[in-house]
Amino acid sequence: MIKTLPAFWAVIPAAGVGARMAADRPKQYLQLGGQTLLEHSLDCFLGHPTLKGVVVSIAADDPYWPGLRCASDPRIQRASGGRERADSVLNALLLLHAQDAADTDWVLVHDAARPNLARTDLDRLLSELADDPVGGLLAVPARDTLKRADANGRVSATVDRSTIWQAYTPQMFRLGALHRALAECLVSDVVVTDEASAIEWSGQAPRLIEGRSDNIKVTRPEDLEWLRQRWAGRR
């Protein structure tokens, strides 16, 4: 029997500047195959039949978002971007709550500069976590040998990679649980770099769902070059 995929909201925090790219604009607005990275990141969600809507968190002075065709898509709402990722995601969740979204609704948070999400990975995440009491995230088992460095940049230890995973997105949690976890982290001055970290801090254990390793986040110029070469091969 085919499992019915759950309905969900998508949240895209897109208020960062991506300083390591050393580009003339925030990295989510760099071009890849005729569209911005942000547009590609949105596409997989906008084409999904169980999507309830999307919230994109944008900086107040962002001059690029209004020029995108997707900015006028009625399925996409804009929330205020915050100082950190957690602030931007929390603002998006507050917007959903203001529109009477339920605490039990699923929310998928995805990086604005992670444009190569496969539909098969999205469906696997939704299917595997549909009945999970906590939620979880796409991730990839560590493949390379890992080294721990000392203060002088020398190897202090080789890390056992057998239980190490790289955290990817989307990350999928219930609206109410994620809202509470992020709010508590901010009040307690706990720095979290992804949503799973906030859920972990609240005492829960998110589930890891193995995804494709090519669902990379664009962080440095070579990441974008790799994707451009891959896109060119699709023609």
Curated annotation (Swiss-Prot):
E.C. designation(s): 2.7.7.60
Involved pathway(s): Isoprenoid biosynthesis; isopentenyl diphosphate biosynthesis via DXP pathway; isopentenyl diphosphate from 1-deoxy-D-xylulose 5-phosphate: step 2/6
CDD domains, alphabetized: CDP-ME_synthetase
GO MF, any single term: 2-C-methyl-D-erythritol 4-phosphate cytidylyltransferase activity
Superkingdom field: Bacteria
Key words of the record: Isoprene biosynthesis, Nucleotidyltransferase, Transferase
Site location (Transition state stabilizer): R20, K27
Catalytic activity: 2-C-methyl-D-erythritol 4-phosphate + CTP + H(+) = 4-CDP-2-C-methyl-D-erythritol + diphosphate
Site feature: Positions MEP for the nucleophilic attack: R161, K217
Bilayer-spanning residue ranges: none
Gene Ontology process terms (BP): isopentenyl diphosphate biosynthetic process, methylerythritol 4-phosphate pathway
Family: Belongs to the IspD/TarI cytidylyltransferase family. IspD subfamily.
Role according to the record: Catalyzes the formation of 4-diphosphocytidyl-2-C-methyl-D-erythritol from CTP and 2-C-methyl-D-erythritol 4-phosphate (MEP).
Family matches, as HAMAP family: IspD
Protein name: 2-C-methyl-D-erythritol 4-phosphate cytidylyltransferase
